[in-house]
């Protein structure tokens, strides 16, 4: 495929005018999406299936009105997916805008001064749950597609919208979408980046370690900790055995931070953080105690759940093997652990994201840089220090970047908002980037 024809100043100006003409529609659409109560993590929100369906119906209707080819289905048990193709002339490169319409719960409603489901525009901001993360970004993508249509520009390559409703629960919609639909040549994930281009993110995995001990009355403890006692026959404290493992993994974390790095990620980003611990007598499994007793019996069960970040260029199997090998080595120095080795559960609750990395020199990155410049914004290329759906595109070899309105600091917080000027700028950049990457077939 030859390089597609790039937009000249005339087509760029036409796109910017078209986006400008859609500003009221942009704010209205984003507010309408915010008004859908799509908090997918809330156990007290039985309305999620119907609200997610309503939200995705708005998305699908918008895209259908553009003349896009719309695909809809549900991921079990109740996550609607909308994928739509704005066809090009088949001579250019293809691009997908990725976004999610599910949000995290409101939390403490008394901490909000704006209605979390109001979608209110006030003081130069759009307020509500999902304004930044990421219904604002979804609205920008949809309005950018309309602006391309309204400008009279015909793209050379197909422009897709991939909109899901299960990102906040680490669902499988995007993964299944990528196996179900034609592959695209690049993706733009519209998460909040405050208009920075973010083509890099680390890998993430959750895992659990479990250790068994032996119960005994606390009055017998002296026999297991002093020379001449009964040792393990007087009880084995699973919490203390776990401390050996926790200490070893903490040392490994420090070693990683000192010896391994990535030029775009903060030093020490690759961490191994213990986040949840459970231990006690009475036994346990899967990170849960069978009973809640008292500390008068030595604990025979302990589990620790970890959040582990690793770097682009590193593989999950290698990281897993390194962690397990270290814990095995520690176990060999302890008679009890040698005979009762720690047990691992990886990808706990399905939490796993592969790393993503697209070179700043990649042509798609250059399309984004050029789009920012044409929109009057200073290009900034940085790393994303959270996990996103970009991971699943990277896993199948699709280059891309995270780019959108809003700040990650606003996400998941009370009085979440997105600046209206960032909404406008992000929409302009998305339209310009699509034209630059897909190419212009006609105008």
For each of these PLM feature ranges, what is it?
Residues 49, 53-57, 138, 320, ...:
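Short, surface-exposed alpha-helical segments at coil->helix boundaries
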Residues 80, 124-125, 159, 300-304, ...:
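Short amphipathic alpha-helical segments
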